[in-house]
């Protein structure tokens, strides 16, 4: 059976899972406006309005299972379950409007006994390329036996959050749910939010 994302409610025509670097370069150059290659061979892209992280727009779902392990305040800002699901559905709806989706299945951490299996679902080739550099890519055999991921990132960053929804301060929202093991990104195409999301999980577990 071919790989698909239907279990997440995502069904698109083109799906690229752990695409090669040359393939991602080609897709970025041919499908993403303004993308070019520098004289050093680096892929140059536009990340949109956001050119850096948005720490004030990061939220963590407040849940009885983990709330006493988190120092809530100006850095760790709480989000309720209902709003998380609104944002998750918004991201999935956006992903379903795209003609192509990129998936990166990779590991966070070197030690096989402790590493996390992470699945990134995104709409831009440069996002996939970035996360292939940030995480540890599986061998062909490891990918074949990857199974279910420990965490899933839904990167719907090309679509804004509804700033009138409770707990939202702007059209950008990066939401972490430690219990459902999901991260939702809206309103920013800055790739560093995916990396920081994974690092936040790793720091919490350590």
Where are these regions (language model features)?
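A noncatalytic interaction/capping subdomain that flanks phosphate/NTP-handling catalytic cores
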Residues: 1-205
